Amino acid sequence: MNLREIKNKLRKVKAVYLAINFGGLCAQVAARTVFRGIAFFIPVKKNRILFRAYEGRGYTCSPKYISEYMKNDDTYEIVWSFNNPEPYDELRRQGIITVKQGSLQYFYYYLSSKVIVFNDLLEAFLPTTGNQVYIN
């Protein structure tokens, strides 16, 4: 294989790489547009707070302690997002709503929560509105 063939192969790989990234970016922009349209019809509840720790993997870290502090105040509706919410029956007995990460219920609570407390990054395809506060 000569140098020209190697360069051509690399260009093809780069083109594929750029095409994949561009496709992902287009999908992300389309999803944000759809969710922004949906968010227009879902009112933000001033007393609702959505929590998530480590992309929904557990009830831990700063979000846990913030929610533990706030659960004593009945004026707030606390929602937790988990990859698997079944093991968290104790939270439900305490009046905390648990939802499955990525479910329709999760998207509803995400769009309707006044405050979003995550210890990781927001999903790139989900917009926050001007009425929402994101705490990381």
Please report, for each region that a protein language model flagged, where it lies by residue.
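Membrane-proximal basic amphipathic "stem/tether" segments
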Residues: 1-50, 55
